[in-house]
């Protein structure tokens, strides 16, 4: 959106690579805490059920693929948690859901044997986190939905130019907002502990 607004004033923004790495000398490393499975007794729905619901929403809109970069949406969808962000049980990662497959982009050191088995049993492919742009550049899908408010420009610009990019709200945010019985019970229990 910013690129379009600047272009109206004959200004151009070109960002290649990580613009901060050359000036931020003591930048902390990416977090490397392991991912862990969020038990179904707390989640209330399996990740298969959630992925099926997401695919149904995508089909209604004629969308083939959804790229998710919001960490809370990824954690909710896959029933996985982590400790990568202080006071937030999320994992630095990306998720691509198509009508045919699911690909999870995560740093290999975060994937324990238990999590790897969990993902494989659910036919969720694992790709390296830092290979997401290369993957998207060769993505063969007809169209892909991204939430522009939650997706950075580097990811956006790496999507295969032959793929139609649809900008809109992620259906995961709306699905996640509808709490099931186990989630409501968890909220009540947390409030009682507070």
Identify the role of each PLM range.
Residues 1-193:
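Terminal domain-start leader segments
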């Amino acid at each position: 959106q910013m690129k379009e607004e600047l272009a109206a004033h004959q200004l151009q923004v070109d960002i290649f690579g990580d613009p901060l790495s050359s000036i931020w000398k003591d930048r902390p490393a990416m977090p490397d805490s392991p991912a862990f499975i969020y038990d179904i007794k707390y989640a209330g729905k399996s990740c298969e059920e959630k992925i099926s619901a997401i695919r149904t929403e995508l089909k209604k809109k004629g969308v083939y693929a959804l790229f998710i970069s919001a960490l809370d949406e990824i954690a909710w969808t896959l029933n996985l948690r982590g400790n990568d962000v202080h006071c937030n049980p999320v994992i630095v990662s990306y998720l691509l859901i198509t009508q045919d497959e699911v690909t999870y982009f995560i740093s290999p050191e975060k994937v324990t044997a238990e999590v790897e088995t969990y993902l494989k049993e659910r036919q969720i492919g694992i790709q390296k986190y830092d290979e997401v742009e290369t993957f998207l550049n060769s993505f063969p899908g007809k169209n892909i939905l991204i939430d522009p408010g939650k997706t950075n420009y580097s990811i956006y610009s790496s999507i295969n130019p032959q793929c139609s990019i649809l900008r809109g709200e992620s259906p995961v945010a709306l699905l996640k907002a509808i709490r099931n019985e186990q989630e409501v019970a968890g909220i009540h229990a947390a409030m009682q502990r507070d």
